[in-house]
A protein has these predicted regions:
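Flexible "cap/lid" loop of the alpha/beta hydrolase fold
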Residues: 101-106, 111-142
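Acidic catalytic loop of the alpha/beta-hydrolase fold
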Residues: 208-212
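Short beta-strand/loop motif that positions the catalytic acidic residue
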Residues: 197, 203-205
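Conserved HGGG/HGGXW glycine-rich cap/lid loop of the alpha/beta-hydrolase fold
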Residues: 9-61
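Catalytic active-site module of serine/aspartate enzymes centered on a nucleophile-bearing elbow/loop
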Residues: 227-259
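Active-site loop/oxyanion-hole signature of alpha/beta-hydrolase fold enzymes
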Residues: 50-91, 249
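Gly/Ala-rich beta-loop-alpha elbow adjacent to hydrolase catalytic centers
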Residues: 92, 96, 100
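Hydrophobic, aromatic-rich cap/lid helix
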Residues: 163-192, 196
Length: 259
């Protein structure tokens, strides 16, 4: 595993690369990358995983003027150009799924498959319906109950973390709120453009996700032409962390079956 800093269109970006073979660009969740969890090692056995820390997370500073999800979509298109990616798979989880969808409605040129893992970013319900749980307002215990099939697996003992890690967690949460504060965690215009995604698309969903439910995933399936929705049992909002083997197996079967 290697970590380096890149300059993309004047923005500094911390980038993790792991594995060899066909490129796979992974856009992380609002909780961050968590490269120490098994998902990354498992995925790197199949692909050359390219995993940037979004601006505001890790050691990636915020974009000048703070930036928007639109900026992130264009930033990662520039990253793909700079790295010369060809026939790559694009994977986005949670907040990263929103960014991945925004990227793909703009250009699918460098990517041959799209995998969205419990993405945010779209409102399918009525004005007074909450499609996406208010993660920032929930008490920690309630958030864990909604986000994980087994809440104990998501628990972090903050008292044992060094100050540098605590500061990074706070920065990431501030950035997450910044990008999705209003309107809350979605782009009202994105739904109308999802038909532009003309690559095979898999929606992987934790069967016990109570941040965005599988019914919300069905809305995504209907909005993207030809998309498939598959549920991962015993997983909540982060199936790549909670059930990494099942996540990698499903992803690999889809990507290799749609080359």
């Amino acid at each position: 595993m290697t970590t380096r800093m890149l300059s993309i269109a004047g923005t500094s970006l911390e980038l993790i690369e792991h594995g060899r073979g066909r490129p796979l660009l992974f856009l992380h969740a609002g909780e961050g990358l968590m490269p120490e969890r098994p998902w990354l090692d498992l995925l790197s056995q199949k692909y050359r995983v390219i995993a940037p820390w979004h601006p505001g997370w890790g050691n990636s500073p915020l974009i000048d003027g703070n930036g928007t999800v639109d900026d992130l979509a264009y930033l990662y298109l520039d990253l793909a150009d700079q790295l010369g990616l060809e026939n790559a798979a694009l994977v986005g989880a949670c907040f990263g799924g929103w960014v991945a969808a925004e990227l793909m409605v703009r250009s699918t040129a460098r990517f041959t498959q799209l995998v969205l893992v419990d993405p945010l970013g779209v409102k399918f319900g009525g004005r007074d319906e909450r499609d996406i749980a208010d993660m920032h307002a929930l008490p920690r215990a309630e958030y864990l109950r909604r986000a994980w099939a087994d809440p104990a697996r998501g628990e972090i003992d903050f008292t044992k973390l060094p100050d540098s890690e605590l500061a990074a967690i706070v920065r990431g949460r501030e950035a997450f709120a910044l990008y999705g504060w209003k309107p809350y965690m979605h782009n009202p215009r994105l739904k109308r453009w999802l038909h532009r995604i003309n690559r095979p698309t898999l929606l992987l969903w934790g069967a016990e996700d109570r941040i965005v439910s599988p019914a919300y995933g069905e809305g995504w399936r209907q909005a993207i032409p030809g998309a498939r929705l598959e549920l991962i049992r015993a997983a909540g909002h982060f199936p790549h962390w909670e059930q990494p083997e099942a996540f990698v197996d499903r992803l690999t079967a889809f990507v290799e079956g749609n080359r």
